[in-house]
Amino acid sequence: MLFFEWDPRKAARNLRDHGIDFGAARAALVDPFRIEEIDQVVDGELRLRTTGMAEGQVVVLVAHANREAENGIDEIARIIHARKASPGERSEYERIRASGGWNPADR
């Protein structure tokens, strides 16, 4: 099972600056048509960026880091940043969604 966590101060700042609530952004991380890419490594932590739908209408890009939960079964996604997708990111997402899904070999 996938669980989510975030810094509440960062979430409040993100909502103010980008108009995207981290709670709503969770939907992008479980969107079956999401595009997930490696973003960067910070202090040994692999960070990903995912473009997907949130609340059925807004395509968002979410920066996050995933880790295994203490029980060794579940996964925790720590949301770091969320924003509306750029026109190019939105176009790529819509193209992939129309084709039935993302294949990493397409990159």
In which residue ranges do the predicted regions lie?
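Ribonuclease/tRNase effector modules and their secretory precursors
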Residues: 1-107
